Design a protein with these regions (language model features):
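Beta-propeller domains with acidic blade repeats across secreted/periplasmic ectodomains
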Residues: 1-168
Length: 168
């Protein structure tokens, strides 16, 4: 008898959520860069410094993966409205960014959008032939054909992955 068995299970605790009903796709709230730094306990003899923030680079919102290339530039996959995308919603405009410090002052001062109109770019890998991006239902290869640090071509390498629940 399932009802008798269920009666023996304990009540699960309520899960706290950041979901705000009535707000389309939730709200993006971040600590200011300095406030975030101030909240981190740093061991004596060490320091942390801000290199790039959403204030200088608004497209940097909700970074998911970062990787340095052999030129010392930081590549960042971003999903600004994740995890609030639902199948049937308008596709998000997720991006793959390149941030760099062109004047060697220890802070990012240049942003290039390598690719936009991505859909849930959960990870990427830099390769000689381009950038492999796992996004949504596909693994794609993005290629920069003219050397301007912007993807010119997208090739689907694998497809058919299920993304009905975007929380992997």
């Amino acid at each position: 008898d399932l009802a008798a068995l269920d009666a023996k299970t304990s009540v699960l605790p309520e899960v706290q959520t950041n979901y705000k009903p009535g707000v389309k796709n939730g709200a993006l709230t971040y600590l200011d860069g300095q406030a975030a730094l101030d909240s981190i306990l740093v061991p004596e003899g060490y320091k942390i410094e801000q290199w790039a923030t959403e204030k200088e680079f608004p497209f940097l919102a909700n970074p998911v993966q970062m990787s340095f290339d052999n030129k010392g530039r930081l590549w960042v996959a971003t999903m600004p409205i994740y995890p609030n995308y639902r199948p049937g919603d308008a596709r998000p405009d997720d991006k793959l960014l390149i941030l760099e410090d062109t004047n060697n002052d220890g802070k990012a001062d240049k942003q290039t959008v390598f690719a936009d109109k991505l859909h849930l770019p959960m990870g990427f890998e830099l390769a000689p032939e381009g950038v492999y991006v796992s996004q949504g239902t596909n693994l794609v290869l993005l290629k920069d054909l003219d050397g301007d640090d912007r993807a010119d071509e997208q090739e689907i390498i694998f497809s058919g992955f299920d993304d009905h629940d975007t929380h992997h």
